[in-house]
């Protein structure tokens, strides 16, 4: 892939980058097509661009998805929405939903910026109606139902009363009802009961009012495993960025990684047997070997938990990471290989090396966290 333009996360001198995250918008488009092939043309797709689009750059991801016909976008909170709107001119018919339950002092920001607000309780609905009335404007809201995640949302038992309150508020416009699955990769049992609770709420509302409302529940795992949960709209996050929702599970959808996290070899040396590498001397050379130092550490997003667990790709060859990963640098055991030189590219995860899922398993975490951890000092480059 060749670089077409750059998104700088920090000012950098001319010359090769030390660490960079290559962002393939072509792979993003491919992944969207894979998702649409599953859901069908009648199902809307909400592009989840919270957390800076899982570290990929919310501005460029949103623009790419809009060009592919996506008009719904999800962010974590109102501040993420405002940042996106300041950096990108959204199309007139595009919508942003902020998932967080708002503080009362933030409600006017939703009105100012035209962001859809999540309502989880009566107090928020009443405050929103009062503020919207004072502004002389209508506020678009979506009801979040807690069917079993235990995080945000009204209980199914209280949902009908809250929906009646929203309906009675002339300055609130209900644009959707949604829920979130706790175990979306396991469609039977608890997840099936969550969906049943949710559909009971939405069905009762539509029967009582004679209105239809946008219903959405399926995140990446449910898109794959729960056809009945796709409803009117789906919310792909990790799947959109090319990772399977369960890192240990075989991929059933041919998505491609959108990010490649890579750095540079900045030093190579030969060490004798018994030489300890890095802090706390957690690894020692069993025999004479060559050690490469790479200019990326945990401050760049290469987790310390990967110490002595990860593998790194250099020149198409896989090498074990050795010693404790430090804040700014990582060491790799080259063995007797003498082909690696200073300046070579070292792929930490991506299409030319180990996957984010493989590294996540080695670190005892999930690919979501690895993608979101790639830090600001790593330059994002669109390819």
UniProtKB/Swiss-Prot annotation:
It comes from the Bacteria. It catalyses: L-alanine = D-alanine. Its EC number is 5.1.1.1. The modification N6-(pyridoxal phosphate)lysine is found at residue 50. GO terms for cellular component: cytosol. GO terms for molecular function: alanine racemase activity; pyridoxal phosphate binding. The active site is at residues 50, 279. Pfam families: Ala_racemase_C, Ala_racemase_N. One of its GO terms (biological process) is D-alanine biosynthetic process. Its cofactor is pyridoxal 5'-phosphate. InterPro entries: Ala_racemase (IPR000821), Ala_racemase/Decarboxylase_C (IPR009006), Ala_racemase_C (IPR011079), Ala_racemase_N (IPR001608), Ala_racemase_pyridoxalP-BS (IPR020622), PLP-binding_barrel (IPR029066). Keywords: Isomerase, Pyridoxal phosphate. Substrate binds at residues 151, 327. CDD domains: PLPDE_III_AR. Pathway: Amino-acid biosynthesis; D-alanine biosynthesis; D-alanine from L-alanine: step 1/1. Catalyzes the interconversion of L-alanine and D-alanine. May also act on other amino acids. Belongs to the alanine racemase family. PANTHER family: ALANINE RACEMASE, ALANINE RACEMASE, CATABOLIC-RELATED. This is Alanine racemase. The gene is alr.
């Amino acid at each position: 892939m060749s670089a077409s333009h750059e998104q700088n996360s920090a000012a950098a001198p001319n010359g090769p980058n030390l660490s960079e995250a290559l962002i393939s918008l072509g792979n993003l488009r491919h992944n969207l097509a894979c998702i649409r092939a599953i859901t069908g043309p009648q199902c809307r797709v909400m592009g989840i661009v919270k957390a800076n689009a899982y570290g990929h750059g919310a501005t460029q991801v949103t623009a790419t998805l809009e060009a592919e016909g996506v008009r719904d976008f999800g962010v974590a909170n109102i501040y993420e929405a405002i940042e996106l709107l300041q950096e990108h001119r959204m199309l007139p018919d595009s919508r942003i939903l902020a998932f967080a339950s708002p503080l009362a002092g933030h409600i006017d920001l939703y009105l100012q910026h035209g962001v859809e607000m999540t309502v989880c309780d009566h107090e928020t609905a009443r405050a929103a109606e009062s503020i919207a009335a004072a502004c002389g404007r209508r506020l678009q809201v979506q009801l979040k139902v807690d069917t079993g995640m235990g995080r945000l949302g009204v209980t199914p038992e209280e949902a009908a009363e809250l929906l009646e309150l929203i309906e009675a508020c002339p300055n609130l416009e209900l644009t959707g009802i949604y829920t979130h699955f706790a175990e979306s990769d396991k469609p039977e049992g608890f997840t099936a009961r969550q969906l049943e609770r949710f559909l009971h709420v939405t069905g009762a509302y539509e029967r009582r009012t004679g209105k239809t409302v946008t219903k959405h529940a399926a995140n990446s795992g449910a898109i794959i495993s729960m056809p009945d949960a796709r409803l009117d709209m789906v919310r792909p996050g990790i799947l959109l960025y090319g990772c399977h929702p369960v890192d240990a599970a075989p991929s059933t959808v041919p998505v491609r990684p959108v990010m490649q996290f890579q750095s540079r070899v900045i030093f190579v040396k030969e060490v004798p047997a018994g030489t300890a590498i890095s802090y706390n001397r957690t690894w020692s050379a069993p025999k004479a070997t060559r050690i490469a130092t790479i200019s990326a550490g945990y401050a760049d997003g290469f987790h310390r938990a990967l110490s002595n667990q990860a593998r790194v790709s250099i020149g198409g060859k896989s090498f074990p990471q050795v010693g404790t990963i430090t804040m700014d640098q990582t060491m790799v055991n080259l063995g007797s290989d003498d082909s690696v030189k200073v300046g070579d590219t070292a792929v930490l995860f991506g299409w030319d090396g180990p996957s984010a899922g493989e590294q996540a398993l080695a670190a005892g975490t999930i690919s979501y966290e690895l993608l979101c951890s790639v830090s600001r000092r790593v330059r994002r480059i669109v390819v």
